[in-house]
């Protein structure tokens, strides 16, 4: 049970959990040790996912990650929440040396949330291009997006700031601006674009 895990890991603090998972806060400096011990001594041999979190620009600590470990023999999850000490330069230790499957999870968190995973063998963006200056899943990133210089292979205009969207594109949560469509069939629009977008007939 959770008390046995706490006694084995003196640095873990229990968290409230809405499900049956054992949930704990874990200091970043102990994350690798906790992952190794869960794998080797407690039979939590599967790292299911790593989810980056942003508590908001006014929060301190602001950034962190949630780790889910699963034991097939126990049919139980352990959830570790690890917050970054520095909100300006968020960083956590990489778990690639413990679980190879951490590779792409950490790259995604680095790409979209801007968390650096120290010790990662090849920490590169996985969705956005390398020169993209922002991290789209941060809470201060506008829902309507931001124009940014594109690599030559993507640019189709002289200043290379954006591409012309295909007819069914147009950014996140935009209604089609030209098609005739019933109100019940419209896709939702973000609050910061709805006011400026023309209404469909």
Task: Please annotate each region the language model reported.
Residues 1-201:
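Terminal low-complexity/charged segments
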């Amino acid at each position: 049970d959770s008390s046995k895990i706490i006694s084995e890991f003196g640095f873990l603090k229990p968290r409230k959990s809405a499900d049956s998972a054992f949930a704990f806060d874990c200091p970043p400096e102990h994350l690798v040790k906790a992952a190794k011990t869960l794998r080797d001594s407690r039979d939590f041999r599967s790292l299911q996912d790593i989810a980056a979190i942003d508590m908001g620009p006014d929060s301190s600590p602001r950034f962190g990650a949630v780790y889910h470990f699963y034991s097939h023999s126990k049919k139980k999850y352990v959830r570790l929440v690890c917050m970054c000490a520095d909100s300006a330069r968020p960083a956590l230790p990489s778990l690639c040396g413990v679980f190879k499957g951490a590779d792409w999870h950490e790259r995604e968190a680095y790409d979209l949330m801007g968390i650096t995973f120290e010790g990662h063998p090849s920490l590169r963006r996985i969705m956005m291009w390398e020169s993209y200056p922002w991290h789209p899943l941060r809470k201060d990133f506008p829902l309507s997006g931001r124009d940014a210089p594109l690599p030559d292979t993507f640019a189709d205009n002289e200043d290379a700031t954006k591409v012309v969207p295909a007819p069914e594109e147009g950014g996140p949560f935009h209604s089609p601006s030209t098609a005739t469509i019933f109100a019940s069939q419209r896709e939702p629009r973000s609050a910061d674009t709805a006011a400026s977008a023309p209404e469909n007939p």
